[in-house]
Amino acid sequence: MNEQQRLASQQANSSTKKEEKDYSKYFESVYQPPSLKDAKKRGKEEVKIERDFGLPEEFRNFGTGRKFYIRTYGCQMNEHDTEVMAGIFTALGYEPTFSTEDADVVLLNTCAIRENAENKVFGELGHLKSLKRRNPDFLIGVCGCMSQEESVVNKIMQKNQHVDMVFGTHNIHRLPYILKDAMFSKETVVEVWSKEGDVIENLPKVRRGDIKAWVNIMYGCDKFCTYCIVPYTRGKERSRRPEDIIQEIRHLAANGYKEITLLGQNVNAYGKDFEDIEYGLGDLMDELRKVDIARIRFTTSHPRDFDDHLIEVLGKGGNLVEHIHLPVQSGSTDMLKIMARKYSREHYLELVRKIKEAIPDAVLTTDIIVGFPNETDEQFEETMSLYREVGFDTAFTFIYSPREGTPAAKMKDNVPMEVKKERLQRLNTLVNTLAIEKNSRYKGQIVEVLVDGESKNNPEVLAGYTRTNKLVNFVASKSLIGQLVKVKITEAKTWSLNGELVEEPIEVK
């Protein structure tokens, strides 16, 4: 997005403003909420790659003596965005804190995927109001996907006037300017771009750990499933250039990271927006096989774009793991059509067959929605039968939650809640049954585990994950944290495995 487009999406009097790329010129408060109607549009505007991000001199030591706190809701993409915002705060001179009471600035990085996530955010805003009363200089910000919704921004402006700033998913690189504006404004500063921005490289990051890292390979989604708000909140599909991704991953490998997760709302669409080269996710994964790093995985996949070349590359193994998260949402072709998933039950099963043929040890997990409008008992049974036929290791299961602004929200929600809950319970029983059955096959096997750290339930126990994303708990020295070890599985549980260390750190080959 260029500056002209940014102003047009935010200010009613945009035609009177200077159409310059120098964002620092604009500090005036903006009070117009975003537009989901505008966010749906997919124009031909060129998305630029900006590689010269830098902090203007005026912001040096801007945050010295101040502390920040970011609370993150939702997906890995939000976690990655938080790492970027933490990097910007640190570059400004702020120090991190793990307490809202100790912070000078609190950001809530929000998720819009379900109503429950939004309720949590508004509940937290209520708690923060007392801190604002005690300290008028205390800054509260709301960012992330919720900020891209008109109804949310309007609710904040009307009922949560103690919030100082609201910004969205497309302009987190403008955080220094938004902070400065919020400090001196007497009203809520709203800077939400309805349309996506450029791809900004070289943004600072404070990564959550030094063992595993998330790397964005693309942004946005053009699939417009009828239930999903993401294409509106994250914008159109924009791919990072492969050389930028490979350089970032090589840098992480050189700094000792063992595992990389490639991120995108739909990673299988990677490269489809390139006009100068034919290059997709399979090509990228083939190049990343040559990088000296132990494991590479990706999320989230869309069955519609999962092509044969990618399957062929994944079958080569090496540092490409055998775990694939492949959301199906429903086992009924009729339901999939209403959801606008653009594939059938048969297409999905054929894709699974190809994956298992190329990767015999592949572990598949999925997402499933129950109680979508018009879902019949027979259609739900199709979902149950597909789950058994594929033999998923586990699934994230949800009761349908209408999201304002999506086509499905206009459909009659005609499945009674008691029916939705009963279906979810039945599905979860099946998920749990297959999960313990799948995990039991690991008993007696020796598996490779990347040690994450101490178990959340017992600090005397170490916890880590296999290549197939199985949680393994075992007793060993804490010096092994961050290392790849061999563990013999002694006990299988529904959601985890217990084992014994049989071999200390192994070399990455």
From Swiss-Prot:
[4Fe-4S] cluster 2 binds at C221, C225, C228. Residues 16-25 have a biased composition (Basic and acidic residues). It is found in: Cytoplasm. It holds the Pfam family Radical_SAM. One of its GO terms (molecular function) is N6-isopentenyladenosine methylthiotransferase activity. Residues 66-184 form the MTTase N-terminal domain. Signal peptide: none annotated. Its main location: cytoplasm. Its cofactor is [4Fe-4S] cluster. GO terms for cellular component: cytosol. Residues 1-25 are annotated as: Disordered. Monomer. Belongs to the methylthiotransferase family. MiaB subfamily. This is tRNA-2-methylthio-N(6)-dimethylallyladenosine synthase. It comes from Bacillus cereus (strain ATCC 14579 / DSM 31 / CCUG 7414 / JCM 2152 / NBRC 15305 / NCIMB 9373 / NCTC 2599 / NRRL B-3711). The lineage of its organism: Bacteria, Bacillati, Bacillota, Bacilli, Bacillales.
